């Protein structure tokens, strides 16, 4: 964070982000490049957030964005709420309010677009980004929603600061249903949020972070929804502990001295029988696909390292991204399902189950007993590879070199470079949801362009009028097809009737007379044109020569108007209605 800001840059960034957001970022001592301690694979978290944003419920409602603020450790060693993952989408047609539509007019301003891209570029470089992983150059247009979403990636919230920090400290959810008209700036990102047209913002604390949801609609508060989302995103930590308790149970069986026991023989967890629901969808039995997304990577059951003093301390292998975390420095917070995993000196009778916030003195102290180990995130692969190196404080903490060599291997070979902050903690395509939304809009616009090229007589150039004209044109074409099919059927039914043929023989010649309905005769259209122009046939002759039939008509006008050649030509050309 040694980058110098000119007065012009400060004015530009403050105009885009808001003065409060800019001052917060500049005064924050927490680097956005912090060591994130993931509570499960990124795919699971991203899929859950995508379900909240991209899968409408029965009422065709879904959130416009979802951000999970995860407990993270900064370079200075303090715990903060940092960017865990997120997903966003643009407002659908008819979903945004009138005020939102007015705000979207600014997208056509090229100067505004250049300013937004420049601000994102400045933030990217300010927070340790490089030209190699710069995503700003690939952006075409930055909408208000995308600007709010991308700028939020650079925020982190210590204890009691910002909306997420205050929500997590208080342990209570925040539901704002009228953000656009509210004068309360509950968060430093309020200006960006209002610029994106968000009407409803919800903050829900969990035991591992804060879930933030937003919508351009005004949504009334729902405690059932809050409870469902809270239990759903809090289930990560409970599943991790349940899996970690199994391999550690073997340590208890080996201990004959009760004072050296680390875990009781069985560790109960309160499992609710009621299946959580989000938008009325059952997450347990009704949707196996959603439960699969909640699956966590199984921790490696590696042997416990022996200290020279003879005591065994549990060291959880975190190479697959599973690691217990708690905001232990937040004294006012009581995270649920918390257990002291790193206190071998504590007697076994102090170990009690924690369900939905138990006794505060027995909470998880793993982060207090650990030094901030190095964590590197690989941004080169589609699946993140996290290699944290935990260090347990002890006066005999030097472990045998052979133990280190035993665990060294592929992880050391693929040790990645640490880069600046990128969304979604290192996926190869960090902005896939933003790009997908942009590609969807571009594809939709291309379809409208193609439709506008084939629809005649367009009344207006807007999309609604174009769709209406296309519907009218298709309806007219269908009517014409039905009329043509009816005429073909009528002609086919009359053609099966045999023509009335009369043959008369004279002395030197034979007279053949053929009679058939006018509609089936080849000259029927000519006769119809005569009728429309009020012309009567005086004489008709038929001659055949050189494989050609010559039909000659002698006509005269039966109306008051004079018969001209132009009128007959217009009638034969199908323009008799203009006469």
UniProtKB/Swiss-Prot annotation:
Disulfide bonds: none annotated. SUPFAM superfamilies: HLH, helix-loop-helix DNA-binding domain (SSF47459). SMART domains: HLH (SM00353). One of its GO terms (cellular component) is nucleus. Residues 428-441 are annotated as: Basic motif. Keywords: Jasmonic acid signaling pathway, Nucleus, Plant defense, Transcription, Transcription regulation. It is found in: Nucleus. Residues 373-439 are annotated as: Disordered. Residues 442-477 are annotated as: Helix-loop-helix motif. Gene3D superfamilies: Helix-loop-helix DNA-binding domain (4.10.280.10). CDD domains: bHLH_AtAIB_like. It comes from the Eukaryota. One of its GO terms (molecular function) is transcription cis-regulatory region binding. Residues 428-477 form the bHLH domain. Residues 393-415, 425-439 have a biased composition (Basic and acidic residues). Induction: Induced by wounding, feeding with herbivorous insects, infection with the fungal pathogen Botrytis cinerea and infection with the bacterial pathogen Pseudomonas syringae pv tomato DC3000. The keyword Acyltransferase does not apply. Residues 382-392 have a biased composition (Low complexity). GO terms for biological process: defense response; regulation of defense response; regulation of DNA-templated transcription; regulation of jasmonic acid mediated signaling pathway. Transcription factor that negatively regulates jasmonate (JA) signaling. Negatively regulates JA-dependent response to wounding, JA-induced expression of defense genes, JA-dependent responses against herbivorous insects, and JA-dependent resistance against Botrytis cinerea infection. Plays a positive role in resistance against the bacterial pathogen Pseudomonas syringae pv tomato DC3000. This is Transcription factor MTB2. It comes from Solanum lycopersicum (Tomato).
């Amino acid at each position: 964070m040694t980058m110098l800001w000119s007065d012009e840059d400060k004015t530009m960034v403050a105009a885009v982000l808001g003065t409060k957001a800019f001052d917060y970022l500049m005064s924050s001592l927490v680097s956005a490049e912090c060591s994130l301690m993931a509570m499960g694979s990124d795919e699971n978290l991203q899929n859950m957030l995508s379900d909240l944003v991209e899968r409408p419920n029965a009422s065709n409602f879904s959130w416009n964005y979802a951000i999970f603020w995860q407990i993270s450790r900064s370079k200075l060693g303090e715990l903060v709420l940092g960017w865990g993952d997120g997903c966003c989408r643009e407002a659908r047609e008819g979903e945004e309010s009138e005020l939102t539509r007015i705000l979207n007019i600014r997208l056509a301003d090229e100067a505004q677009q250049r300013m937004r891209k420049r601000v994102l570029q400045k933030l990217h470089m300010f927070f340790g980004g490089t030209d190699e992983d710069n995503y700003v150059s690939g952006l075409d247009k930055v909408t208000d929603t995308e600007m709010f979403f991308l700028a939020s990636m650079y925020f982190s919230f210590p204890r009691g600061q910002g909306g997420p920090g205050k929500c997590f400290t208080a342990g209570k959810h925040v539901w704002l249903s009228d953000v656009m008209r509210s004068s309360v700036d509950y968060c430093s990102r309020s200006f960006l949020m209002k610029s994106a047209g968000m009407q409803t913002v919800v903050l829900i604390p969990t035991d591992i972070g804060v879930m933030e949801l937003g919508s351009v609609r005004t949504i009334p508060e729902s405690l059932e929804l809050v409870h469902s989302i809270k239990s759903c995103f809090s289930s990560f930590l409970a599943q991790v502990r349940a899996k970690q308790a199994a391999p550690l149970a073997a340590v208890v069986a080996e201990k004959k001295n009760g004072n050296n026991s680390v875990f009781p023989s069985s560790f109960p967890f309160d499992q609710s029988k009621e299946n959580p629901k989000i938008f009325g969808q059952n997450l347990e039995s009704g949707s196996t696909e959603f439960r699969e997304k909640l699956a966590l990577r199984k921790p490696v059951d590696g042997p416990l390292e022996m200290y020279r003093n003879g005591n065994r301390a549990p060291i959880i292998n975190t190479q697959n991204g599973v690691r217990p975390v708690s905001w232990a420095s937040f004294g006012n917070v009581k995270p649920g399902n918390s257990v002291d995993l790193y206190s071998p000196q504590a007697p076994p009778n102090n170990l009690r189950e924690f369900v939905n916030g138990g006794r505060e003195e027995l909470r998880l102290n793993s982060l207090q007993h650990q030094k901030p180990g190095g964590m590197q995130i690989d941004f080169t692969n589609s699946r993140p590879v996290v290699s944290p190196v935990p260090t347990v404080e002890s006066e005999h903490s030097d472990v045998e070199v052979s133990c280190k060599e035993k665990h060294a291997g592929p992880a050391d070979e693929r040790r990645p470079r640490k880069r600046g902050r990128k969304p979604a903690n290192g996926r190869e395509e960090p902005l896939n949801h933003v790009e997908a939304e942009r590609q969807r809009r571009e594809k939709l616009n291309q379809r409208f362009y193609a439709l506008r090229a084939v629809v005649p007589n367009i009344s207006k150039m807007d999309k609604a009028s174009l769709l209406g004209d296309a519907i009218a044109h298709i309806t007219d074409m269908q009517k014409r097809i039905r009329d043509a099919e009816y005429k073909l059927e009528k002609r086919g039914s009359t053609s099966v009737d045999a023509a009335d043929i009369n043959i008369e023989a004279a002395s030197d010649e034979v007279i053949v007379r053929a009679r058939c309905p006018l509609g089936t005769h080849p000259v029927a259209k000519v006769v119809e044109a005569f009728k429309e122009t009020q012309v009567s046939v005086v004489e008709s002759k038929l001659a055949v020569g050189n494989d050609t039939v010559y039909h000659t008509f002698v006509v005269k006008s039966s109306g008051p108007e004079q018969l001209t050649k132009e009128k007959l030509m217009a009638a034969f050309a199908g323009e008799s209605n203009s006469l």
